[in-house]
C-alpha cells in the first residue's frame, strides 16, 4: 500500500500501487507531495496450531516480465533463493505460475510482509501487482515455502487452472475501477460488503450538476458527442474531490454526489471553487465545434448526519442515506436563480475557520434571497453562471466538422455477431426455476444471476454448432468419496462421448472446477443439467468463449486432488475459493452489461457507446421524505434495503437491467420487446410492498408503512463508459431517463401504483393492453399516461401519510412508556402522572413547556453510585436499543476518574438518553465532554438536569453540536454550579469562535457571561 502526503502532512491519501499514486499526484497538480510505501492492515491476535500471533496473509497477482524464461528449471532456481531468504525472515507462502502470471500468497507479521513487499515491488521480474486479499489470519496455512513444486505443470496438466488464473487477472484489473472504494476495500480484506453494518457519520456533502445536460441531450448535433462530455465531467470531478480528502459517493448520469469529513469543510469549499475554475480553463482551450466547450458545473455544500450503508444484494450499491440529501440538492438548484456556481448552507458557514470566513466575507458573503426550508443559504462573489445564457449557447451550438472521439452508434447497426451485451437475452425457458425459499437466500440469488453471465449476446449469435469452451466452479453439496468420483467418471464419460463433448473435471476438497468443450447447444444443455444436479451447489460460471479446437482429447479427463497432491500443494483449494468469493462480490456492484462483456473474453473499456430504444422503469418509496426526516437512520436503512432487495430481484427475474441506485429510487431498463415483462416486474414490486405491510401490520415496525409507485416509459437512451482508471461508470442517459422519474411521481396524483406512458401499451400484448390499463387524467410532457387497472394497483396517498403519522406517533408513545417503566421519564417526578395514565414523552411536549428544570427536586431514596454508570447504560440499552460497547467502556472508566470523555461516541440520537441517565450517577465528575454528538435545543436542558447531582462539575463541553441554536436553553438557572460551557463550533458561539475546534482550553463561554448581542449570529 502507498500513501501520498501533501500540504505539510495535512492531506493524506492511500493507493494500492505506485502507478496509481503517481497518476493521482500528477492529475491533481500536487507539487509538494511525497509517496511512502507502508502497510496499515490490522492483524489478528490469536494464533493457530503453532501458537503464533499477529499474522497476516497477502494474496496478489502479477505479470512476469520474462515469460519465455519461466520454465521448470528457472522456477527451481527461484525456489532455492526464496526458501533461504523467507525462512530467515519467518515468512511462509507459495508461488503458482502460469505464463505470464505469477500468483503468490505470503504469510507473516506486518513488519516481515512490509519488508518483503518493498523488495518485491522493485523486482524487475514481475510487474502490475494486483492485490486479491489482504487481512489477518490465524496461524500458518502453508509450509515455509511451497515454490519448488508450485509450478503449474508440476501440479496438474488441467488447463482449467490456467483459465482460472487468467480470469482472476482480467476480473480484478477490469472491474476494480467500477467498485465504490468502500466495497473495493472490503473485498480486498476478504469481507462481504452485504454483511457490513451501516456506518453513521457527520459529513459535508455536495451535489454537483452538469449544467443543462438535458438540453445537450436534446440537441441533434450534440448527442453524438455525449461520450466526450460525460467522461470529461467525471475526470474533472474526481481529482478535485479526492485531492481535498473527499469521497465520490456516486455518479448519476450528469450528477456527482460527494462527501467530506466534518473537519474538511474548508478543503471541500476550495476543491469546488477550483473545479469551477478548471472547467472554465477547459472550455477556453477547446476548438470551435467541440462539445467540451459547453461543460459548466454548479453545486451546493451542506452539512448533516448521514449513514453510509449497503443496500440490495442481487444488484447492490453503497449509498448515503439522510434527510440532508434532498436539502443539498435543493441548495444546488437554488444556484440557478442566484446565477452563481457555488452555494453553501448556514451549517457549513458555522464550521468555517476564522481565516476562511473573513476571506469570504470580504468577497461579499451574504444570504441568498431565497430559502431552502429549513436551511439558510449563502453565496459569495464568484464568476456569474447564467443558466439561460448556457442554454442559449447549447441551442446555437454548431459542431461544424468536429467529430466525437468515440461517437455513439445505433445498437442495430453493430455487427450481428459482436453486439454489446446490454440486454440479458438468456433463453429463460431453459433456466431452472427457483423456489420461494431459495429466493430469500441472497447467495443463491446472486449465484443464479452470475450463472446467466455464461451466455453473453456475442455467444448467442454463433449458432448452436459453434465450438465453445465453458469453465465453471461449484461446491459439493455432500462429502464426495472415491467411489462417488469413480461413479461420476463412469457415467459422465459415456454421456459426454455420446454428445461429442470433451471435459476436464478437477476436484479439490469439496470444490469442483469443470471445463466443457463442444458445440454450443450441447455444452449449454449439459451445463443447465449440471446446475440442477443436487450433488453440487453455488455454481459460478467463470468463463465462456468461442474456440477453434478443443484442448482435451477425452470425454472426461478427471483430476482428483489426493492427500498426496494436497500435501505437495495445499493452497490449491484456497486459491479457487478466493476466486469464487471475489467474483461474486465484484459482480454484485459492477453493472451486468460490463460483467457479461468481460465474461465473453472482452475488455469492458472497449464497450462501444450505443443509442438504443428501451422500456425504462423507475420506482421509489411513497412519502419517503417524511419517513427519512422523522425516522432514525437505522430505520431508513432497513426500509431502503428491504425495498431495494425486492426491486432488484423482481427486475432481474423478468430480464431487466438495474442501473445505479439513487437513494430509495431503483431505475432499470428492459429490451423494447419486453414491455410485458416490465409490467410484470412492476406488479411484483407493488405486491411485495402490500405483503410487507400486511406482515408487519400488528407490529410496530417501520416496514409496516412501506408503499411505492412505479413508472414505465419508452424512449431512446445512450449507453456509454465514463471516467478513467481511477473511477469508471457505465452511464445510461437520455430524456426518457429523466422523464420516467416524473412518471413515477405522477402515481401520487393519479392514485395508481403503476403508471405507464402512451408508447408502452403499444408494445404490450393485446390481452394486457386491452383489459389491464385505464387512462389517467394527467400526463407528462404532453404524453398520455395510463394506470394499471385493479383494486390491488390503487395508491391512496392520504392513507399512506396517515399510516406514517400513526406509526411515528405510536413509536413516540412506546418510547415514552419505556422511559416510565425504567424510571427515566422525569417530567412527572415529584407529582401526579398525567391524565389518563399516559406518560409524557420528552419528544412530545405539551404547548408552552420549556427546558427549564427549576422545579427539580432530588429523590433522597435514589442511590447515585458512580460504579453503577456502566450498568445503568447497559440496562437501558437492553430495553430497546442496541448496545454500543465503546460507550459502556468509557462510562466504566469514568467511574474512577474525575472526567468523562464522551466526545463523538454516539452513533445515533437514540443512544443519548441512556448516556444522560448514566451521567447522572457520575457524581464525582469535574469535566464532562459531550462534543460532536446529538445535543440540541430539545434535549440540552435535560442533559444539564442530569448533571445537577454532580456538584463538582465545572466544565461541560458541548462543542460541535450545530443543533444548539437558542441561548435561552443554556441560562445559568439550569445548573448554577457549572462554571464553563464550551460551545465552539455551534450556532450560538461568538462570531470569532465558530470554527470547529478540538481543544477544551480555547473558545470557552462562561455561564456567568451575558448571553446577549454578539453571542448570536447576525442572520
UniProtKB/Swiss-Prot annotation:
Organism domain of life: Eukaryota
Domain Guanylate cyclase intervals: 204-332, 615-744
Note in the entry: The 1224-5/1F strain is deficient in phototaxis. It is not known if this is due to defective adenylate cyclase activity or defective BLUF domains in this protein.
All residue ranges annotated as the BLUF domain in the record: 55-148, 467-559
Cellular component annotations (GO), alphabetically ordered: motile cilium
SMART domains tied to this protein: BLUF
Positions of the UniProt region annotated as Disordered: 825-863
Protein known as: Photoactivated adenylate cyclase subunit alpha-like protein 1224-5/1F
GO MF term list: blue light photoreceptor activity; FAD binding
Organism per entry: Euglena gracilis
The keyword Cell inner membrane belongs to this UniProt entry's keyword annotation: no
Amino acid at each position: 500500500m502507498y500513501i501520498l502526503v501533501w500540504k505539510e502532512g495535512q492531506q493524506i491519501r492511500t493507493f494500492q500501487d505506485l502507478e496509481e499514486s503517481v497518476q493521482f499526484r500528477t492529475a491533481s497538480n500536487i507539487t509538494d507531495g511525497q509517496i511512502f510505501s507502508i502497510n496499515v492492515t490490522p492483524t489478528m491476535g490469536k494464533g493457530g496450531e503453532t501458537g503464533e500471533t499477529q499474522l497476516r496473509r497477502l494474496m496478489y497477482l502479477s505479470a512476469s516480465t520474462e515469460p519465455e524464461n519461466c520454465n521448470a528449471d528457472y522456477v527451481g532456481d527461484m525456489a532455492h533463493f526464496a526458501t533461504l531468504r523467507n525462512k530467515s525472515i519467518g515468512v511462509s507462502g507459495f508461488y503458482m505460475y502460469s505464463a505470464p502470471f505469477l500468483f503468490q500468497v505470503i504469510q507473516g507479521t506486518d513488519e516481515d510482509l512490509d519488508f518483503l513487499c518493498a523488495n518485491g515491488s522493485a523486482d524487475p521480474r514481475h510487474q502490475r501487482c494486483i492485490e486479491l486479499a489482504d487481512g489477518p489470519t490465524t496461524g500458518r496455512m502453508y509450509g515455509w515455502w511451497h515454490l519448488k513444486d508450485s509450478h503449474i505443470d508440476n501440479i496438474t496438466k488441467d488447463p482449467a487452472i490456467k483459465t482460472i488464473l487468467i480470469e482472476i487477472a482480467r476480473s480484478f484489473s477490469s472491474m476494480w475501477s467500477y467498485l465504490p472504494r468502500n466495497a473495493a476495500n472490503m473485498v480486498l480484506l476478504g469481507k462481504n460488503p452485504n454483511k457490513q453494518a451501516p456506518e453513521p457519520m457527520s459529513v459535508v456533502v455536495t451535489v454537483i450538476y452538469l449544467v443543462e445536460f438535458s438540453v445537450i441531450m436534446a440537441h441533434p448535433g450534440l448527442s453524438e458527442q455525449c461520450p466526450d462530455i460525460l467522461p470529461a465531467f467525471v475526470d474533472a470531478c474526481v481529482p478535485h474531490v479526492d485531492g481535498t480528502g473527499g469521497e465520490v459517493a456516486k455518479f448519476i448520469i450528469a450528477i456527482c454526489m460527494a462527501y467530506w469529513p466534518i473537519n474538511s469543510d474548508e478543503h471541500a469549499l476550495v476543491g469546488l471553487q477550483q473545479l469551477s475554475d478548471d472547467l472554465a480553463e477547459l472550455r477556453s482551450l477547446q476548438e470551435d465545434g467541440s462539445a467540451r466547450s459547453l461543460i459548466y458545473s454548479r453545486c451546493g455544500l451542506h452539512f448533516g448526519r448521514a449513514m453510509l450503508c449497503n443496500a440490495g444484494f442481487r444488484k447492490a450499491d453503497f449509498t448515503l442515506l439522510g434527510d440532508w440529501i434532498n436539502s443539498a440538492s435543493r441548495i444546488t438548484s437554488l444556484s440557478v436563480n442566484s446565477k452563481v456556481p457555488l452555494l453553501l448552507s448556514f451549517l457549513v458557514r458555522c464550521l468555517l475557520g476564522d481565516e476562511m470566513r473573513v476571506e469570504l466575507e470580504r468577497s461579499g458573503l451574504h444570504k441568498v434571497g431565497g430559502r431552502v426550508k429549513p436551511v439558510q443559504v449563502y453565496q459569495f462573489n464568484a464568476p456569474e453562471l447564467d443558466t439561460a445564457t448556457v442554454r442559449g449557447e447549447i441551442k446555437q451550438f454548431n459542431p461544424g466538422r468536429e467529430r466525437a472521439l468515440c461517437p455513439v452508434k445505433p445498437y442495430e447497426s453493430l455487427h450481428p455477431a459482436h453486439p454489446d451485451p446490454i440486454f440479458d437475452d438468456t433463453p429463460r425457458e431453459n433456466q431452472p426455476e427457483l423456489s420461494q425459499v431459495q429466493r430469500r437466500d441472497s447467495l443463491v440469488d446472486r449465484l443464479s444471476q452470475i450463472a446467466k453471465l455464461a451466455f453473453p449476446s456475442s455467444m448467442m449469435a454463433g449458432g448452436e454448432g459453434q465450438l465453445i469452451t465453458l469453465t465453471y466452479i461449484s461446491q459439493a453439496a455432500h462429502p464426495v468419496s472415491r467411489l462417488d468420483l469413480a461413479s461420476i467418471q463412469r457415467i459422465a464419460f459415456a454421456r459426454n462421448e455420446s454428445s461429442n463433448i470433451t471435459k476436464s473435471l478437477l476436484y479439490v476438497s469439496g470444490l469442483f472446477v469443470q471445463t466443457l468443450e463442444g458445440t454450443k447447444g450441447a455444452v449449454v444443455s449439459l451445463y443447465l443439467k449440471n446446475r440442477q444436479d443436487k450433488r453440487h451447489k453455488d455454481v459460478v460460471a467463470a468463463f465462456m468463449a468461442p474456440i477453434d479446437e478443443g484442448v482435451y482429447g477425452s470425454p472426461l479427463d478427471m483430476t482428483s486432488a489426493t492427500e498426496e497432491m494436497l500435501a505437495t500443494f495445499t493452497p490449491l483449494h484456497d486459491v479457487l475459493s478466493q476466486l469464487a468469493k471475489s467474483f461474486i462480490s465484484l459482480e454484485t456492484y459492477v453493472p451486468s452489461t460490463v460483467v457479461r462483456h468481460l465474461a465473453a473474453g472482452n475488455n469492458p473499456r472497449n464497450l462501444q457507446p450505443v443509442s438504443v430504444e428501451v422500456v425504462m422503469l423507475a420506482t421509489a418509496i411513497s412519502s419517503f421524505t417524511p419517513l427519512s426526516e422523522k425516522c432514525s437512520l437505522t430505520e431508513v436503512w432497513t426500509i431502503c434495503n428491504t425495498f431495494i432487495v425486492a426491486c432488484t430481484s423482481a427486475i432481474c427475474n423478468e430480464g431487466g437491467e438495474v442501473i445505479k441506485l439513487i437513494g430509495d429510487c431503483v431505475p432499470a431498463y428492459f429490451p423494447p420487446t419486453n414491455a410485458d415483462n416490465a409490467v410484470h416486474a412492476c406488479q411484483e414490486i407493488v405486491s411485495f410492498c402490500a405483503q410487507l405491510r400486511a406482515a408487519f401490520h400488528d407490529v410496530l415496525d417501520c416496514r409496516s408503512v412501506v408503499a411505492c409507485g412505479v413508472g414505465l416509459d419508452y424512449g431512446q437512451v445512450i449507453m456509454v463508459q465514463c471516467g478513467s482508471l481511477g473511477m469508471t461508470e457505465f452511464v445510461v442517459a437520455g430524456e426518457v431517463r429523466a422523464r420516467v422519474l416524473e412518471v413515477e411521481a405522477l402515481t401520487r396524483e393519479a392514485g395508481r401504483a403503476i403508471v405507464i406512458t402512451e408508447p408502452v401499451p403499444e408494445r404490450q400484448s393485446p390481452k394486457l393492453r386491452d383489459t389491464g390499463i385505464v387512462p389517467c387524467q394527467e400526463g407528462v410532457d404532453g404524453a398520455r399516461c395510463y394506470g394499471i387497472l385493479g383494486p390491488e394497483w390503487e395508491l391512496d396517498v392520504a392513507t399512506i401519510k396517515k399510516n406514517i403519522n400513526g406509526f411515528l406517533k405510536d413509536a413516540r408513545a412506546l418510547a415514552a412508556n419505556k422511559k416510565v417503566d425504567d424510571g427515566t421519564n422525569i417530567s412527572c417526578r415529584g407529582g401526579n402522572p398525567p391524565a389518563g395514565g399516559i406518560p409524557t414523552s420528552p419528544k412530545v411536549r405539551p404547548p408552552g413547556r420549556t427546558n427549564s428544570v427549576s422545579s427539580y427536586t432530588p429523590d433522597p431514596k435514589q442511590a447515585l453510585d458512580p460504579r453503577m454508570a456502566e450498568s445503568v447504560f447497559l440496562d437501558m440499552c437492553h430495553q430497546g436499543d442496541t448496545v454500543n460497547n465503546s460507550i459502556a467502556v468509557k462510562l466504566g472508566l469514568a467511574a474512577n476518574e474525575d472526567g468523562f470523555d464522551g466526545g463523538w461516541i454516539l452513533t445515533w440520537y437514540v443512544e443519548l438518553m441512556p448516556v444522560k441517565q448514566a451521567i447522572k450517577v457520575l457524581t464525582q465528575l469535574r469535566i464532562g465532554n459531550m462534543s460532536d454528538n446529538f445535543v440540541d435545543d430539545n434535549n440540552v436542558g435535560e442533559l444539564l438536569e442530569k448533571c445537577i447531582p454532580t456538584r463538582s462539575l465545572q466544565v461541560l463541553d458541548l462543542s460541535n453540536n450545530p443543533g444548539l441554536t437558542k441561548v435561552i436553553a443554556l441560562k445559568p438557572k439550569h445548573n448554577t454550579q457549572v462554571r464553563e460551557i464550551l460551545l465552539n463550533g455551534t450556532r450560538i458561539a461568538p462570531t470569532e469562535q465558530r470554527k470547529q475546534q478540538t481543544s477544551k482550553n480555547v473558545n470557552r463561554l462562561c455561564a456567568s457571561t451575558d448571553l446577549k448581542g454578539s453571542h448570536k449570529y447576525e442572520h
